[in-house]
Amino acid sequence: MDRRKFLTSTAALASVSLAGQTISAKAQRILDHDSEEYWQTIIDQYEVPDHFINLNAGHWGMMSKPVLDAFIEHTKFVNSHNSQYIGHGVVTDPDARNYGKEYGEILAMLAKRLGVGTDEIVITRNATESMQLLISGYNKLKAGDTVLYTDKAYGTMMVEMRNLKALRGTNVVQLKVPHPATYENQIAVFEQGIKENPKTKLILVTHMSNQTGVIVPIKEIQRMARGCGVDVIVDMAHSFGQYDYDFADLDLDFVGFNLHKWIGAALGVGLMYIKKDRIKDIDKKLSFGPDDNEEIRFRALTGTMNMAIVLSIKDALYFLDDIGIKHIDRRFKALRDQWVKEFLDDDRVDILNPEDDRMHAGLTTFRINAIENARELGKTLYRDYRINTTTIGNLSGVRIAPGLHNSLDEMDKLAAAIKEIASKQ
């Protein structure tokens, strides 16, 4: 779907009986993009159940109505046109759609957004796949080298790092991240880890922790590690699309992204980035000959993917661009602050990411200090208050991950629920 058709579809889907205007047209008239009036026009772009409040957008994001509609049309098209859409070099109709061409257009959109080359990125099925390919494929390790990761990394990535002991013969060290987190101690934990483990060759860094929502100073960590001769693999599953940053300025080498969380594409799509001059440092999954050694796509050969899901990336990017990443960044912080501010001076409740604006977006974990069983707390929130969350058992915490479909009023209801539960302990 091209941008003009997408915007037309958006307006048609969002029509309301307010003076005959469409929501998209109304949104364009509202100059204050921080106002709840403006954000209600965005919320109305989502089909949200009314029998619970969904504050668990961190597992996967919700497609907006225009993106969902486009995805359904993509599915119908791929199904009906079948392998003709691939072409296989035999379809010569000049007007025929071609998946290879459209895939290339989507790569170009993603590359432009990141400020990188299309030959430095490849689409995967999720961030986990991207990260597994990078970690297991990193071929600069030799027996006796050390790799580091922290206790705030994503669980599957921890397992993948531990697997390097059997795969590469490395020593694997887990670092403990201090709480409360500060800008300085998030750098220091890796700096000290490298100092204490002089054979360190690789570290895994999670840009935004799925456990706490803490955003680490990745640019400084990358610079420090590079100065020590240490490579960095970065997990950006939760920061991409939720947090405004200049990716190219970070000067990273190896990164895994998710596109169905905060970007809002259909479920089942991610992205892998390898800096052009580092591609050879990640093993190929399959080789068709010596000439493919320079190509990133041979590091992520997953077989036939769901093409309709891939096509939905373009529609999701259009939708986000109509809002603007700076506005999205501010919105997520506003949603977080709306409930977190109620507990900054409350000794009963611990907020697990700091007030430093550089270190949080929307995703935030809390715990009620009198309750050790996070699962029971999560159950209470859903059973008694109809609030859907996820729990972080090792922290006795409940993670709050609002999406663009959430309102400030829903954050107030969350705060009221936490206060009531805490008062009963």
Where in this protein do the model-derived segments appear?
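Pyridoxal 5′-phosphate
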Residues: K5-Q425
